[in-house]
Amino acid sequence: MGFGDLSPTGSRGRAPGLMASALLAEVLRGGHVESVHSGSVVVCDAEGAVVFAAGDPERAAFPRSAIKALQALPLLASRTADRFALTDAELALACASHSGLPIHVQTAQAMLHKAGRDGTCLECGIHWPSSTTAARALAAAGHTPTALHNNCSGKHAGFVCTAVAAGQDPAGYIGPDHPTMRAVTGAVAAVTGAALGAENRGVDGCSIPTFLTPLRALATGFARFGTGRRLPAEFAAASVRLRRAVAAHPAMIAGEGRFDTEITAALGETAFVKTGAEGVHAGALPALGLGFALKVDDGAGRAADAATAALLLRFLPAHAVLERWARQVLTNWNGLAVGELRAV
């Protein structure tokens, strides 16, 4: 993957706080470049040593949903998962940005029932399923979505379970000062080594805190997540269970036709990958002892998917699924091939 140097603002100079980015992906039409996507990517080991980088490895980004697996660590480390006998499918959903399919909704609901709660406890907000099939079926039945359809409902169900198991009132768990959320933030800080405080805190789409974090710290954290190195014993054990759960249930992590599900179904435990909003992806290559993090400057998920697939091809054996995501044929409404999106 030959990432080329490119300023995030082209000839007008660099955006404030950004070093030169790298060209990560481009869109071609008729053999000519129509659009380009720049950004930064870094691969680290568990000690934080940079193995590969393009763009600015210290570039800070809000990791968004890319760190859901790290946010799920207290669910296991606190023994909440054991207390409520959460299944591997439920643990996978706790790491997911799901499509709102019936199986996703039912699984989140089952998690809450084990804690004696229901969907009214969720504070993630409500949106229609991202699966058009699921959304149309819901509307055709005369129903409207609930918080259980939110793509983050599995993660939030895990937060509610953790609070209940600790004897806490789960109300307000999305706030930065709620004991459960403090444990979640503390886990992410411990794994990544990043300083997470009010000065770099924002509010995520599902209303929990999200913190501006250097890509290098995210990559290091995922190297640790993938290997257990430099982690407390309880987090190391939790990481293994979460990785295995997601690998065993790839349909839970996202949904049919989506990047996370297709890559996980193809590679199993060879790679852990997770997408986040605004072009952030992160993950681990456990057997190689590496973690990675990537941010596309303009937030384009299509570019992040392609660049992540190409990055995996750099470190792993060739695989048809990776190659298809790294270089995607673009078609129009008549089904004609009109161009391609490709990592560069």
Per-region residue spans from a language model:
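Short Gly/Pro-enriched turn/cap motifs at secondary-structure boundaries
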Residues: 30-33, 149, 270-274
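Active-site SXXK
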Residues: 63-80
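Structured C-terminal helix/loop/strand segments within mature extracytoplasmic catalytic/sensor domains
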Residues: 223-344
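Beta-lactamase-like hydrolase cores
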Residues: 2-6, 10-58
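A short glycine/serine-rich beta->alpha loop
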Residues: 54-62, 94-98, 141-150, 202-209, ...
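Bacterial peptidoglycan biogenesis and beta-lactam-recognition machinery
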Residues: 76-84, 116-120, 167-172, 178-185, ...
